[in-house]
Swiss-Prot record:
Keywords: ATP-binding, Cell inner membrane, Cell membrane, Kinase, Membrane, Nucleotide-binding, Phosphoprotein, Transferase, Transmembrane, Transmembrane helix, Two-component regulatory system. This is Sensor histidine kinase YpdA. Interacts with BtsT and YhjX. It comes from the Bacteria. Residues 343-554 form the Histidine kinase domain. Residues 25-45, 96-107, 161-172 are periplasmic. It comes from Escherichia coli (strain K12). Autophosphorylated.
Amino acid sequence: MHEIFNMLLAVFDRAALMLICLFFLIRIRLFRELLHKSAHSPKELLAVTAIFSLFALFSTWSGVPVEGSLVNVRIIAVMSGGILFGPWVGIITGVIAGIHRYLIDIGGVTAIPCFITSILAGCISGWINLKIPKAQRWRVGILGGMLCETLTMILVIVWAPTTALGIDIVSKIGIPMILGSVCIGFIVLLVQSVEGEKEASAARQAKLALDIANKTLPLFRHVNSESLRKVCEIIRDDIHADAVAITNTDHVLAYVGVGEHNYQNGDDFISPTTRQAMNYGKIIIKNNDEAHRTPEIHSMLVIPLWEKGVVTGTLKIYYCHAHQITSSLQEMAVGLSQIISTQLEVSRAEQLREMANKAELRALQSKINPHFLFNALNAISSSIRLNPDTARQLIFNLSRYLRYNIELKDDEQIDIKKELYQIKDYIAIEQARFGDKLTVIYDIDEEVNCCIPSLLIQPLVENAIVHGIQPCKGKGVVTISVAECGNRVRIAVRDTGHGIDPKVIERVEANEMPGNKIGLLNVHHRVKLLYGEGLHIRRLEPGTEIAFYIPNQRTPVASQATLLL
């Protein structure tokens, strides 16, 4: 009995050594990451198999010799590997351990039994991994280990040259080997404690993502470069990153942290890695690589931002040290990117709705603007006596202009030719007022055939006449041009007035305009929200040019009538 007790202590001693090694292994972040994953790559499975195979080989080497047999914890190593990482690890480890056990004692009493049960232990452990709930694996693992050791004892008795020798060996090593299988449960429980840490870490990451969302929510009400920069600062500070960036499909919208100076001189185009993430709609992780422009960065996480199923940008997280992108950080960042995507989509929808409301208000103002009606009626009354035909045409222009405005819907997409007809009616009335002072030139590409939101061009024409031509003493020219430009259509309004004040351009870009100039800012907002970039405003010598671009989406036209230029 004393000898059996000593052997049991030897088994627990070697199992304890394995537990200690595992304890230190799970302190290593890379190994802990393997434990957290639900699926592993072949390379990762190969690494884990090598670790548990070494445990199994060491168990055989350190075994206590007894009558041609070895008291060891080989089955514990094989079972633990299979239960924790799946059948491939268990079976391959079992085969390696079994072959090694056979080769070090070819022809030995226990060589064949140990070879057989080592492989069987790998198969059983793999089955436990696939079929048994995690909470029960440690218990079933103990039973599986005891079953394998019991089978080993039976095979030793059967395989021994004499039954007496087999029984003698089993009587000495059977109890220690079978009871030692309890250590399988200890190992599995140790790893499950890491799983508990994973769940706690996931809870912390979820709370962190929600905290960041709460802090950034007010900033998404009015999205601009400054608000996005503050969002990046909050994310960087809360997750202790070295740099954070947000991009759209072409440019870096905001960048905060290490390497920020690389994005301050207009060189803000996205990197090839970011382009790849957007093209494939997949997360890209680089854990040991230099960033595109910042060699100090060695870890990078690029997550696509989605709106209505389309990638509209990315969230990028950087660290100076390598291997900083953990699975928990990735999961948190993915959740955070989903929140940001939702907030951006809601913000865009709200701004579109607000712009549509302002456009409707602007249309209503045009409909009932007493000054416009007063001037139009004055022009008509003056023409009645001098030129009745002109007066009749002006009445027709005015009625068609008012009917067009009344029938408008919020951001309705209309044929660009229909929009230009409405502008011609407006200009006809204005030309009646200004006479020879106002000349309008139409530079329209007749091949252009697309749809645009209503009331995008008319406010620009009104701005050119009222703020460009009217203040001048002499004659003035307004040019309206529509032309194809690659895969887009360029729409521009140019006047020969005094030229726009540069401060007005700055205020438009900063979204700050007085109430009496809401038309220009409204068009800038709507174009930017709908097509990604706002108005292009240039001060000329003389005059001003305001242009914007829309996609060249050809649509069928009911009538092929051309504009009367």
